From Swiss-Prot:
It comes from the Viruses. Keywords: Host-virus interaction, Inhibition of host innate immune response by virus, Inhibition of host IRF3 by virus, Inhibition of host IRF7 by virus, Inhibition of host RLR pathway by virus, Viral immunoevasion. It comes from Thogoto virus (isolate SiAr 126) (Tho). InterPro entries: Mx/ML_C. Signal peptide: none annotated. GO terms for biological process: symbiont-mediated suppression of host cytoplasmic pattern recognition receptor signaling pathway via inhibition of IRF3 activity; symbiont-mediated suppression of host cytoplasmic pattern recognition receptor signaling pathway via inhibition of IRF7 activity. Blocks host IRF3 and IRF7, thereby inhibiting IFN-beta expression and activation of host antiviral state. This is Protein ML.
Length: 304
């Protein structure tokens, strides 16, 4: 398939409720992280079956492991009207004949979810990216199942395009806003070093992120963005900013408060075996954001 065709990520075609978890797994395919995400959704009573199944399928594809306790998600669900063995047999036949997409579309939601559980639980069955896309995309975008669109998706097993997790997206927006505002400092401003330090921190961060996304460096995107937030917080803790004035300074100050709040919402958690992973407390961040009545003045205007 042509290499210049776009590669769609799972998070682009899954249901909205599963998107955050799937983005996390796509961005950080570490076994410990993905396993934790799967178990959280498996045991989450408020998660509906379709959401849990989509998280399960992406976990199965990324980890190449049978999801632990996958049949537990069917607890309390009446599946007696279906024969899972027959469903699976028909699905395997449709794979051989190239009609799997049409077969999945012929199933109702419960039958498809039941089939997904049995497919994921089969240690002898491998899943490729196209199969997972076929399972999880039907609810969001039926056009993904047309032959022409499937061709344009380049559904292979190569790495997905860069996708940022929820907190990373927010950090990038804040970075772009601060960087843009810092270039608009007043001509007679006495706080030249303050603005220069901000621009330097943002430019260095952008250079690292660009190199990372192009595969030139092996930097961890999480570490780069956290380092940038720490640097911005440090710059605003120095006395240089006291000389800054005007609208641009007010916007910078408000955005820096958001940076500090976002940074406080992210921390490293250490497992019993000594392995570390990042935890983002979105509820803490959103609670703090409620203090901003209408958001940062001119915030959206400076995002590019």
């Amino acid at each position: 398939m042509a290499s210049n065709l776009p590669v769609r990520s799972f998070s682009e075609v899954c249901c909205a409720e599963a998107r955050a978890a799937i983005i996390q797994m796509e961005n950080n395919p570490d076994e410990t992280v993905c396993n934790r995400i799967w178990k959280i959704h498996r045991d989450l009573q408020s998660s509906d079956l379709t959401t849990t199944v989509q998280v399960m399928m992406v976990y199965r594809f990324i980890s190449k492991r049978v999801p632990e306790g996958c049949f537990a998600i069917l607890s309390g669900v009446n599946t007696g009207m279906y024969n899972p063995r027959e469903l699976k047999r028909s699905y395997v036949q449709s794979l051989s004949s190239g009609t799997s997409c049409e077969f999945l579309r012929s199933l109702d939601k419960l039958a498809k979810n039941l089939l997904a559980v049995h497919v994921c639980s089969d240690v002898k069955m491998s899943l490729n990216k196209r199969q997972v896309i076929d399972f999880i995309s039907g609810e969001e975008d039926p056009t993904l199942h047309t032959a022409e669109h499937l061709t344009s998706l380049a559904l292979d097993d190569s790495p997905s395009a860069v996708v940022y997790s929820g907190w990373q997206q927010e950090a990038i927006k804040l970075h772009n806003t601060i960087r843009k505002i810092a270039t608009m400092r007043p001509a007679d401003c006495k706080a030249g070093k303050f603005y220069s330090d901000i621009l330097s921190a943002c430019d260095q961060t952008k250079e690292l992120l660009d190199a990372f996304d192009q595969g030139k460096l092996a930097y961890d995107r999480d570490v780069v963005l956290i380092g940038w937030m720490d640097e911005i917080i440090k710059i605003f803790s120095k006395p240089d900013y006291l000389e800054a004035k005007g609208v641009s300074y007010q916007v910078l100050k408000n955005v820096s408060n958001k940076v500090a709040l976002l940074r406080e919402s992210i921390w490293w958690v250490t497992e019993l075996d000594g392995r570390e992973y990042l935890f983002f407390d979105e509820s803490w961040y959103l609670h703090g954001m409620s203090a901003f009545s209408d958001g940062v003045p001119g915030y959206e205007d400076f995002i590019y």
